[in-house]
Amino acid sequence: MRSGFLRSARRLWARRAISRMPPPSEELLARGGPLRAFLERRVGSEAGGLDAGSPQLAAAARLLNEKERELRDTESLLHDENEDLKKLAESEIALCQKEIAELKHRIISLLVPSEDMDGSDLILEVTAGVGGQEAMLFTSEMFDMYQQYAAFKRWHFETLEYFPSELGGLRHASASIGGPEAYRHMKFEGGVHRVQRVPKTERQGRIHTSTMTVAILPQPTEIKLVINPKDLRIDTKRASGAGGQHVNTTDSAVRIVHLPTGIISECQQERSQLKNRELAMKKLRARLYSMRLEEETAKRYSARKIQVGTKGRSEKIRTYNFPQNRVTDHRINKSLHDLESFMQGDCLLDDLIQSLKDYSDYESLVEMISRKD
């Protein structure tokens, strides 16, 4: 019963995505719809008392009923013979419909349970996958895109690791990103990203397919995660690679091993050993916290199409097709046709992330309803 309801809800979303109509969450909230029935059970019917435990939700539900009643009354004036009155009614109807849409959006935001980590900062990790040098070049472009997106959102972006390839690409990199709701926006970026294009070195014009992987790790506070110093082994060594004279003269690189789990965190980005130790600990804390959340997250998202956590990291989530100037997110069947602008990491990326958030909210609502039925 529940799985069938979820499948039906996904087909509804898919049809809306193809037709570019508004998200169906509002349709679920229509009078007589399943979400409306759930809402009335949650806050109480008009005849009964409203739930004092949800005052904001109760107030919004009451106002929605009033506005819908006002809309029905105003629509009846459209049949009046007085043209001035009909024009006034049309204006009032447009305003009323706008207010109803805003109220539904407000109710949905109050109904959808917030995740504990949504307000957290995060660790971004990018790693080249299949495709050799082309995969490394794409990984570098993706890292730049996320750095530009952080600037667009006015978040703090700090590079923790950066391992370039010999020909200008990027093997692996990580960064700390902090700002209002940073994790809430970025959490669905984790997974396998596929690029299709003709490499600059390709003489016959053949399209190559390469991949890279993005991991998004919520960054815990000191209160949420306590690490026993006895569980850590901290080693220092000389940094390798580019970096100036300090590479061969200073033991600035830091390697931290969490003995109970075997998780390793390294950093040699900075000249200061203390700074590298701080950054390595930041990454270690994020990985331990992410591992702790995996079991809970897997249960919570087991029935969802959009995955968060390790399961999501192995899933191909998006294709960047340069010959077609198209980026497609496979989870919500949405395509955008301005790839160059998308890679700038501003409005188009933000729009796609908002669509993913909308779909996630939609699945949350559908699951909420199906559990109650």
UniProtKB/Swiss-Prot annotation:
Any Pfam family: RF-1
Coiled-coil region(s): 56-111
UniProt modification remark: Methylation of glutamine in the GGQ triplet by HEMK1 is conserved from bacteria to mammals.
Name assigned to this protein: Peptide chain release factor 1-like, mitochondrial
Origin: domain of life: Eukaryota
Domain comment in the entry: The GGQ domain interacts with the peptidyltransferase center (PTC) of the large ribosomal subunit to trigger nascent chain hydrolysis.
Motif GGQ, chain ranges: 243-245
Keyword Coiled coil: yes
Modified residues (N5-methylglutamine): Q245
SMART domains reported for this sequence: PCRF (SM00937)
Residue range of the transit peptide in the UniProt record, numbered on this chain: 1-13
InterPro entries found in the cross-reference section: PCRF (IPR005139), Pep_chain_release_fac_I (IPR000352), Pep_chain_release_fac_I_sf (IPR045853), Prokaryotic/Mito_RF (IPR050057)
GO cellular component terms, semicolon-separated: mitochondrion
Presence of the UniProt keyword Coiled coil in the record: yes
Subcellular location: Mitochondrion
Gene3D superfamilies (alphabetical): 3.30.160.20, 3.30.70.1660, 6.10.140.1950
Family: Belongs to the prokaryotic/mitochondrial release factor family.
